Structures are given as structure tokens and as C-alpha cells.
Amino acid sequence: MKNNLLFTEHKLGPITLRNRAIRSAAFENMAYGNKPSQDLYNYHTAVARGGAAMTTVAYCSVTRSGVSFDGQLYIHDEIKEDLKKLTDGIHAEGAKA
């Protein structure tokens, strides 16, 4: 494929993406106990390793009462390190998170 834009680097505001392939957010149902699991980590790092420029973790709640489903992330102080591990893993594979 001559000059296929999908595989070219792209600037998105201040962020430079290695290509234009982005995995959009979808409900993975892998946040067991409403926190990032090893399955969630493995899934998103595999997407990044596969060549996606960016992967978006599924929607999450900012309050306990906002949790709609089991397996949905709930942002609170106790999971900051888990989220950092997930983000660092995605970045280590060359993708944005």
C-alpha cells in the first residue's frame, strides 16, 4: 500500500502517535473488585504490543455510587498504583494510554 496514512506518525495536539491506529474505549469487564486486574493489564499491553498507537481503558466511575456494573473501574486513591502500572505497561510497549 503506497502512502497509507494509517501507518504514518501523527501529531494529536501535543502528543505524537506512532501511527493512526487507536483502540477506542469499550467495556472490558476486567476490573475485578472495581480495580485494574492482571487481565486488564495483559489485554491493554497486548493491544499496545500489537502496534496500536493508543489504547483507551473503558469508562470508569469517579464515585462508588456511580458504578454501573461489576467489573467497572472506580477511581479512588487505593488504585493509583494499579493505574500507574497499567499506564506504564502500555507506554513500555510504545503506545499512549
Which stretches of residues belong to each language-model region?
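Flavin-dependent oxidoreductase catalytic cores
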Residues: 1-97
